[in-house]
Amino acid sequence: MKLVLAIVLILMFLSLSAGAETSDNGVSRGGHRPQYWPVTPPSIVCLRSGEDCENNTPCCPGLSCRVSADLATLKLSLACD
């Protein structure tokens, strides 16, 4: 019984140490943390009137609008037809 317990403990220790090595190697290879999108949503601007649109406010009343996104500046634009 003691032999089985010793083997289980050794296997657990080896698996923990092997996991630590692989995670350390991944950090040293990467060299930087990944960049994430900001928490706040991007702003939406109506192209015809130039006004900011918030939540469900209609920017271009009575006109059909297309939404375009500029990922570099995180801005969404509405083009009104």
Curated annotation (Swiss-Prot):
Major localization class: secreted
The listed locations are: Secreted
Q: Could you state one GO cellular component term attached to this entry?
A: extracellular region
Question: What are the disulphide bonds in this sequence?
Answer: C46-C60, C53-C65, C59-C80
This protein's superkingdom? Eukaryota
Q: Which residues form the propeptide?
A: 20-42
Q: Which GO terms describe its molecular function?
A: toxin activity
How would you summarize where this protein is expressed among tissues?
Answer: Expressed by the venom duct.
Q: What is known of its domains?
A: The presence of a 'disulfide through disulfide knot' structurally defines this protein as a knottin.
Q: What is this protein called?
A: Conotoxin Lt6.4
- Organism for this UniProt entry: Conus litteratus
- Which taxonomic lineage does the organism of this UniProt entry have? Eukaryota, Metazoa, Spiralia, Lophotrochozoa, Mollusca
